[in-house]
A protein has these predicted regions:
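Short, solvent-exposed loop/turn segments at secondary-structure junctions
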Residues: 408-413, 495-497, 511-513, 561-566, ...
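Phosphate/adenylate-binding glycine loop and adjacent helical scaffold
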Residues: 594-599, 603-605, 763, 767-894
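Active-site-proximal alpha/beta segments of enzymes that process anionic O-linked groups
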Residues: 212-213, 254-405, 410-657
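Substrate-binding rim/cap in mid-to-C-terminal beta-strand-loop elements of soluble/periplasmic
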Residues: 487-513, 656-657, 715-769
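Transmembrane and membrane-interface helices of multi-pass
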Residues: 1-334, 892-894
Length: 894
């Protein structure tokens, strides 16, 4: 083979493997004590040495059929490793995390997923060029060095074999073998070696002193046999491996397996089957569900008696509500007659996990969600309304004819709205010189003015002399009376940092499925989604065009300016029951006749492209005496944070502590937040112009947050459990509702039951619909946010769960009664993380350990015994919760 090509290929492989291994060591070194890391460091490179040697052997074979085949295999390995290394380095550059190759494959097989992967393709390409350049520079010297090492190793290996032979065989056998062939190195080089020394290189000379009596030598048959240095090195390596085994056995919580892994071995994850974990419904805290704690049925409340079969849960299983129509809409399977008639054997055959995976169903009599048998169920519907709402609810003066649900992509709570003096504002100001602060604050005051009016939270924007900045509101002429505007939730969390999973939770009132990607799209929601509930109302009453809006039919629509084909979102949208959908595909068809419409990113168009569609929808619905449920998913605040060409971007981040490029992503994100705020103002103005503002409930919620390197070293949502990815705004906007700032540690799971509670409490449904809604709202797991929230009930905590993108690796857990937060590694491949959001709201002082026992010990020492007990409890209920979601979603991984 061409020696130059061979050297270059090997250099590519060597540089790729070495660069990614050093990165892996850097990312995981904090998981080891310094002494352990230093002692084990040589052993961590063992797999790398073996792989590099194997590739060297493949591409350095001599001519012939076998040699040519080996060279071809080696070439493929080198090229694949180059691509993998550049991708891994590029991923770390952008996110600060490690790339999972199984996930990369899922993206690669999806058209929209490929667009995501290619959106930052310049970075991996740059790393690939850097690797190629470095490989070209070092190829000759590297090849020569490796040749020397391999040749020397071969010689010493033969010496070692010969030395072992002298220890094993008798002198006579040794002499006999000596007459046949000698394996010992002598003063002459071994000419049989596949690798030749450069005779001009003094460093390659290997000589042997044969001085009798030299330490480490043995005289056999008149000839001195030396203990080769290879054996000494081998003993050293064996000692290191022994120490590593001891460390592993006595401290197996450390990530030793991660340190041994090296490219291209992780690529095998592409071919790995989905892991199958059987669910178990055994509640881990049995003392909390003892019979003395059971609750009887009371009105629409179904009672609560989880555990073994009993009258309370059996009554719910067999109930057939009076409001049930003859033809059930999709989503109401558990109320059908067929679900009541199955015997035990039929249930066993059809139930949740009776599949080829060998898992048995632990709750055979409950194939559907049963609120009476839910150990975590806490209802607050028996509480009165929040004090500011009580009078207006008694007067029944609020009218809710229409509902708009605005799901805002990557919207952080701190930016809805941005307020002067907050931690996020301080983060921005640190990038500016103090002399520029007034100018920057005036600029920042224009980021979220409409969000201020929606939430009722003032931005408090003023100069250093105390003078407020004057602002103009060009998008929305809000005429809401002072003291009114609705309920703003402070302290809310998302249920998942995966957009599609969050969308399902918001629309259906369900916890997400703790598996990677949007597998919920392949199943039926275990709770009726809001469009399905509205379709139930349509079927309960006659289809008339009555002037009484409570007798009118609901017309649900979904608007999204980008693709809904990513990870099967379109499939789930259809299942939810939207009758009118506008997405990128529809807009792109119309864009042929409207050249002003432009795509701004790999997903699609800006939200402003939807303005005419939304206006037409409202106009037609009001003309046809229909009640509207309009769901709108924004997208501009998604990576890559691009805005239309006509939008005037601003420089919000400064250069006081580095170049502007340092804050490029956050600056782009802030511009998209301002764009989204302006768009929201336009939406609210449309409602005003259509004359429906006073009868429309508008719900604003973020699907998840967005972490930047200004927050934490690891950016984005993928594999990143940082709190900035999970805090979201939630606001129930209505101009006739009193303004309420409700501080509560809840999640977006509570949105759907709150909407139903509002419809019932404001007399916005006819009697039949009211009966159905008042009954259904008791079946959802979330509490109502227009009533005092129950943080605990009879010793039970109100637990909050949030999955980390991509969904099946990490689960974050909080409870409404404490400020503590646990990150639970469901896949056992990452660290346990504890934080106290009360004293450390931005999670700057995390506690990380590789086992729960170690974490509990550290938390007990740094925080309190109570906190340590809490995290043990959180881990137990978290694991139960994850498996229970698989049962309820009827998840079949096969």
């Amino acid at each position: 083979m061409n020696s130059s090509l061979t050297s270059f290929l090997f250099a590519i492989f060597f540089v790729s493997v070495t660069a990614t291994k050093l990165l892996r060591l850097y990312l995981n070194a904090h998981g080891f004590p310094v002494l352990v890391f230093v002692v084990c460091l040589p052993a961590f490179f063992l797999a790398d040495v073996i792989l590099i040697s194997a590739v060297w052997a493949l591409i350095c074979r001599k001519n012939g059929g076998l040699g040519l085949f080996g060279f071809a295999v080696g070439c493929v390995i080198c090229v694949v490793t180059l691509g993998a290394a550049s991708s891994q380095l590029g991923f770390y550059y952008h996110t600060g995390g490690e790339l999972d190759w199984g996930d990369a494959t899922k993206f690669a097989f999806s058209e929209d997923g490929r667009k995501v992967l290619l959106s930052e393709g310049a970075t991996p390409l740059s790393f690939a060029c850097a690797i190629l350049l470095l490989s070209w520079i070092v190829k000759s010297r590297l090849s020569k060095l490796v040749s020397i090492i391999v040749s020397s190793g071969a010689v010493h290996a033969r010496s070692a074999l010969r030395w072992v032979a002298t220890r094993t065989y008798s002198k006579s056998k040794f002499d006999k073998a000596e007459t046949e062939s000698s394996l010992l190195p002598t003063r002459e080089h071994d000419s049989d070696s596949d690798f030749l020394y450069d005779s001009d290189d003094a460093n390659t000379d290997i000589t042997h002193n044969e001085t009798p009596g030299q330490p480490g030598s043995e005289n056999v048959g008149g000839r001195t046999i030396y203990c080769p240095r290879f054996v000494t090195g081998g003993y050293t390596m064996l000692v290191l491996l022994a120490l590593l085994c001891i460390f592993t056995i006595f401290n197996h919580d450390r990530p030793y397996n991660r340190m041994f892994t090296t490219l291209p071995l992780p690529l095998l994850a592409v071919f790995a089957p989905k892991p199958v974990e059987c669910s178990s419904s055994s509640w881990p805290l049995p003392a909390l569900i003892e019979k003395v704690r059971w609750e009887k049925q009371n009105g629409n409340y179904k009672g609560w008696a989880p555990g073994s079969a009993n009258e309370v849960i059996e009554k719910y299983r067999q109930r057939v509500p009076d409001w049930l129509p003859s033809e059930l809409p999709y989503g109401f399977a558990r109320w059908s007659q067929d679900s009541k008639s199955e015997d035990v054997q039929t249930l066993l055959h059809n139930t949740t996990l009776s599949h080829d995976d060998g898992c048995a169903d632990p709750l055979i009599l409950d194939p559907y969600y049963n609120p009476a048998n839910d150990p975590m169920k806490i209802t607050n519907l028996d509480n009165p309304f929040l004090e500011p709402l009580q009078q207006i609810m008694q007067e029944r003066s609020v009218k809710i004819k229409h509902i708009a649900l605005i799901l805002m992509e990557s919207m952080r709570e701190e930016l809805f709205p941005l307020q002067q003096g907050t931690g996020f504002h301080d983060l921005i100001m640190k990038s500016h010189d103090e002399l520029d602060h007034d100018d920057i604050n005036e600029l920042l005051s224009h980021i979220s003015p409409n969000s201020e009016r929606i939430t009722g939270l003032e931005g408090n924007w003023m100069g250093q002399n105390g003078t407020s900045f004057g602002r103009q509101f060009s998008e929305w002429n809000d005429e809401t009376k002072p003291g009114f505007g609705g309920i703003n939730i402070r302290g809310a969390l998302t249920t998942s940092s995966v957009s599609t999973k969050s969308l399902a939770a918001v629309h259906c009132g369900t916890w997400p499925l703790a598996v990677d990607m949007f597998e919920e799209a392949e199943a039926e929601s275990y709770q009726p989604c809001l469009p399905q509930v509205l379709e139930l109302f349509n079927r309960i009453k006659a289809n008339t065009s009555s002037d009484d809006f409570r007798e009118q039919q609901w017309y649900p629509a979904f608007f999204q300016a980008v693709t809904d084909g990513y990870d099967r979102q379109d499939k789930f949208d259809d299942k939810m029951g939207f009758k009118h959908i506008v997405n990128k595909k529809r807009i792109k068809q119309d864009a042929l006749y409207n050249p002003e419409l432009e795509e701004i990113n790999y997903f699609g168009f800006p939200e402003t492209a939807l303005k005419s569609y939304i206006t037409d929808y409202i106009t037609n619905a009001t003309a046809n005496n229909q009640r509207m449920f309009m769901s709108h998913f924004t997208s501009t605040t998604h990576h890559p944070w691009a805005t239309p060409k006509w939008f005037n971007a601003s420089e919000y981040m400064g250069t006081a502590h580095g170049l502007m490029q340092t804050h490029k992503d956050l600056n782009s994100y802030l511009n998209t937040v301002r764009f989204t705020d302006a768009w929201i103002g336009q939406l609210m103005q449309i409602l005003d112009e259509q004359g429906i503002s006073n009868e429309t409930l508008v719900v604003f919620v973020g699907d998840h947050g967005q972490a930047f390197k200004e927050d934490v070293s690891k950016t984005g949502t993928y594999g990143n459990p940082h709190i900035s990815n999970h805090r979201v705004p939630i606001t129930f906007r209505h101009p006739q509702l009193p303004r309420v700032q409700h501080q509560v540690n809840a999640t977006s799971l509570s949105i759907l039951p709150t909407i139903l509670d509002l419809l019932v409490s404001t007399d916005s449904l006819n009697p039949k619909d009211t009966a159905a809604a008042a009954d259904l709202v008791q079946d959802y797991e979330g509490q109502s946010l227009i009533r005092p929230f129950k943080a605990t009930h009879k010793g039970r905590r109100a637990w909050n769960y949030s999955l980390v993108n991509p969904g099946g690796r990490m689960l974050t857990i909080t409870s409404s009664d404490t400020p503590w937060r646990l990150v639970l590694p469901l896949d056992k491949k990452t660290e346990y993380i504890f934080s106290d959001l009360g004293s450390d709201p931005m999670e700057l002082e995390l506690v990380l350990e590789w086992s729960l026992s170690s974490l509990a010990s550290t938390v007990r020492r740094k925080h309190s015994e109570e906190a340590a007990d809490w995290l043990r409890e959180a881990e137990k209920v978290g694991l139960w919760w994850a498996s229970e979601r698989k049962r309820l979603w009827k998840y079949n991984p096969s």
